[in-house]
UniProtKB/Swiss-Prot annotation:
GO function terms (MF aspect): identical protein binding
Signal sequence interval, chain numbering: 1-24
Major localization listed first in the record, in broad terms: secreted
Keyword flag Nucleotide-binding: no
Domain Collagen-like: 83-124
Localization per Swiss-Prot or TrEMBL: Secreted
Biased amino acid composition, Low complexity: 90-100
Protein name in the entry: Complement C1q tumor necrosis factor-related protein 6
Domain C1q: 125-264
Amino acid sequence: MRVIMGIASLGFLWAVFLLPLVFGVPTEETTFGESVASHLPKGCRRCCDPEDLMSSDDTVQAPVSPYVLPEVRPYINITILKGDKGDRGPTGTPGKPGKNGTRGDRGSQGVKGDKGQAGSPGSSCQTHYSAFSVGRKTGLHSSENFLSLLFDRVFVNTDGHFDMATGSFVAPLRGLYFFSLNVHSWNYKETYVHIVHNEQAVVILYAQPSERSIMQSQSVMLPLVPGDRVWVRLFKRERENGIYSDDVDTYITFSGHLIKAEDN
């Protein structure tokens, strides 16, 4: 009787200790897919068949969950990953020129600049000149030949370019010269005088016979070279002519001067 009571008391104590374990230990719960798969029939399979020969019919796909999971995309902050500045790259090929733009407006006038430095001295300027003016106080009549008109009075003769002995001007420089001749005609006689360049008559001074004597003039410009001669001649007697003058006044004058010198 005591043995039975002892065993009964031990059984009660074990029950007290085992109850918390039974109710406290979690048990595995089958998922919806596992539950469905466990209830679906499987095909016939021999125990000796390898597992990889299982028919596709033996595998049952679990249904898709009705809940859609959100797609998670990671965000990377690029500024955090920015590196150091790289080296300068090589120069590229020049591009094609663009089209010409429209002309801009005229800008305002700039301020006056500073005075520049003085230049180096230039070469000395050479002034070329030549002039003469002579007169005659004696009348002249024509003869059998041409007569060179000589002069007995000098008004101007720079550097002696007019030869008083021959009555001719000798050009000292190449250039353009101006000449003028003034005479007084004789009563009832023609006046027939030429201005001559070397041996060529260039212009004539002429007056018809008249009861009264008058003043006549002629002028001309000539290009000359050094050594050229210009002089005055009276026509020969085949045409009776003459020019008048006296000891009191000078009626006959011959003048000339250089207008512009030319480089040789």
